[in-house]
């Protein structure tokens, strides 16, 4: 009897689902402060990022972009949503190429490269450029990898 070879399905790199908490931070100290919160549940397949963001305690009817912050004032918009009357927000994004991971300094010095994920008001983004108003942003607690 002829032995059959088993074919293996190639799994995407980093194909497991992971979570990143997004929080308010003091822009002078970068310490976490009380306020709105969120969580991004994501998958990273090479440089393609997909996932679901759920936020709470946000201003009702406010429009937000979920972004991958690159450098300077460059961002890639992952998705957009409007906060409901209870202050909750859900944004889902299909796989988007976010380019190569970046090696960050500050809190991330010496750590493997990754992606910063932020929630920012839609009014703060124009043509992929970010207007810096950090008091209205939610910032990542850890990098997407």
Name each region found by the language model.
Residues 1-145:
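N-terminal targeting/export leaders
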């Amino acid at each position: 009897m002829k032995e059959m070879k088993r074919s293996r399905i190639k799994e995407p790199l980093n194909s497991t689902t992971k979570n990143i908490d997004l929080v308010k931070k003091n822009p002078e100290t970068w310490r976490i402060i009380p306020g709105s919160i969120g969580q991004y549940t994501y998958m990273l397949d090479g440089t393609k990022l997909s996932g679901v963001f759920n936020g709470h305690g946000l201003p009702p009817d406010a429009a937000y972009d979920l972004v991958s912050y690159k450098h300077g004032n460059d961002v890639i918009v992952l998705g957009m949503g409007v906060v409901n009357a209870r202050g909750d927000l859900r944004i889902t994004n299909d796989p988007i190429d976010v380019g190569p991971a970046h090696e960050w300094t500050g809190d991330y010095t010496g750590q493997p490269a990754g992606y910063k994920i932020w929630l920012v008001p839609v009014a703060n983004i124009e043509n992929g450029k970010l207007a810096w108003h950090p008091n209205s942003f939610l910032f990542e607690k850890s990098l997407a990898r």
